[in-house]
Regions:
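Post-transcriptional modification and biogenesis factors for structured RNAs
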Residues: 1-201
Length: 201
């Protein structure tokens, strides 16, 4: 059984930070819903689970071939970024999602956020875009890391169902959307048209 001092656990704990995720090309997904969604997407490399959680989620773990490591409760707490650890955490590969790949599919609707910094808000946008049938979400400008734990939880798994693209250059991203034939509409607090009248566009 792995403890919080185990090298494998210590390496995974570094994925709580953006720099750690970027360097490793991996992220952590916690809880049965997110882990199940990540497993279905084929992103899970390994799973850390306590004995109690292993019994509770036996069917979920048995249905996939990812490496499963039993961990102590203290290790599970170190791997968690929530107040109440679920005892089930997956180490996942960051998906390589590019805007050109999304546009190659001739999308009809793409949700774009600009300079969104709050992970909960970003996750909510991803969840809503998925529910609306959008082909992708673009986080443009200096935006939050979509694989931040809070963003993952706010997306309620939608981040595994819809491509999410990080595009630091806002102008270039908008230009690419227009070049692909998409009409670009923006919302603003002081916009010229109310949303109720937007169907005229």
């Amino acid at each position: 059984m792995l403890t919080e001092r185990s090298a494998r656990v210590a390496t995974a704990v570094k994925l709580h930070r953006h720099v750690g995720r970027r360097r490793a090309g991996r992220f952590l997904a916690e809880g049965p819903n997110l882990v199940a969604a990540a497993l279905a997407r084929g992103l899970v490399r390994e799973v850390f689970v306590t004995e109690v959680a292993a019994r509770r989620h036996e069917l979920l773990l048995a249905a996939h071939e990812a490496s499963v490591h039993l961990v102590t409760e203290r290790a599970a707490k170190a791997l968690s970024d929530t107040v109440t650890p679920a005892g089930l955490v997956a180490g996942c590969d960051l998906p390589a999602t590019r805007l050109e790949d999304v546009l190659a599919g001739s999308p009809q609707l793409i949700a774009v956020t600009v300079e969104i910094r709050e992970p909960g808000n970003a996750g909510t946008v991803i969840r809503i875009a998925d529910a609306m049938g959008a082909a992708a979400v673009i986080l443009a400008g200096r935006s939050v890391d979509p694989y931040n734990g809070k963003c993952l939880r706010a997306s309620t798994g939608s981040i595994f169902a819809i491509p999410v693209v990080v595009a630091p250059d806002v102008g270039a991203a908008i230009a690419d959307l227009r070049a692909a034939g998409l009409q670009v509409l923006a919302t603003a607090v002081d916009g010229e048209m109310a949303l109720d009248d937007a169907d005229r566009l």
